[in-house]
Regions:
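Noncatalytic regulatory segments and standalone regulatory/sensor domains
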Residues: 154-188
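Conserved beta-strand elements of beta-rich interaction domains across eukaryotes
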Residues: 45, 55, 134-135, 149-150, ...
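Active-site nucleophile-adjacent alpha helix/oxyanion-hole segment immediately C-terminal to the catalytic cysteine
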Residues: 2-91
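Short, surface-exposed coil-to-beta transition loops
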Residues: 137-142
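Conserved active-site-adjacent core of cysteine acyl-enzyme catalytic domains
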Residues: 78-135, 146-148
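Eukaryotic basic, amphipathic alpha-helical target segments in cytosolic regions
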Residues: 56, 60-61, 109-113, 136, ...
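Short hydrophobic/aromatic-rich beta-strand segments that constitute the beta-sheet cores
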Residues: 130, 152-155
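Amphipathic alpha-helical interface elements that mediate macromolecular binding in regulatory proteins
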Residues: 46, 50-54, 99, 103, ...
Length: 188
């Protein structure tokens, strides 16, 4: 192994070790091996942002109604009406803006820092939400990443099941598209 490969392996090991204690399995689940350890919602309509949040949170916690109410609350907080601006946050077919996703997460007790994608405090990270401007469908798409049961998982609502990936694949994918850390509620 050359010096560059040794450094790369060392960095990957450090990254893997750092996330092992950060991301926890969903409450009550104790699994091992490559068994799929949690909930994954497949896409219906263009609700990929909502599905990605539910995949990170581990259940059907966010509904289309929640998304609409969160978007309206966001507009109200920003001093806007709910006309055309609402369609910018929640399209009729279910495509959601990052502002709407952040607002619904706040309503559920989580946070998403819009100014610092994926660079926020990892010790409270529940998972990662990633925006992919061009997907296989030719439109915008949201996917999720979680660390669970000793493995890193890519949760894409267009896919039939979660896909286990390596720390190297995660690091590469996080650098390719805008990615946000979903933060757990702070306790204290």
């Amino acid at each position: 192994m050359d010096a560059g490969e040794s450094v790369r392996q060392s960095l990957l090991k450090e990254f893997e070790d750092s996330i092992k204690d950060i991301w926890a399995p969903p409450a009550g689940q104790k699994l091992g091996g490559s068994e799929e350890p949690f909930f994954q919602r497949q896409q219906r309509g263009r609700h990929c942002g909502m599905h990605a949040l539910n995949n990170i949170l581990g259940g059907n916690f966010v509904t289309p109604t929640d998304m609409m109410e969160a978007a309206k609350a966001y507009l109200s907080e920003q001093g806007h009406g709910t006309g055309d601006e609402l369609e910018d946050l929640v399209e009729k077919d279910g495509n959601y803006s990052i502002e709407a996703l952040a607002s619904v997460l706040r309503d559920k007790g989580y946070s998403l820092d819009l100014s610092e994608p994926a660079a926020t405090s990892l010790e409270r990270a529940k998972g990662f939400l990633q925006h992919r401007p061009e997907s296989t469908t030719g439109s915008h798409h949201w996917i999720a990443y979680r660390y669970c049961a000793g493995a890193i998982w890519r949760l894409d609502s267009l896919m039939e099941r979660p896909e286990q990936i390596t720390p190297e694949e995660l690091a590469k994918e996080l650098s390719e598209n805008r990615t946000f850390a979903i933060q757990r509620p702070a306790h204290g």
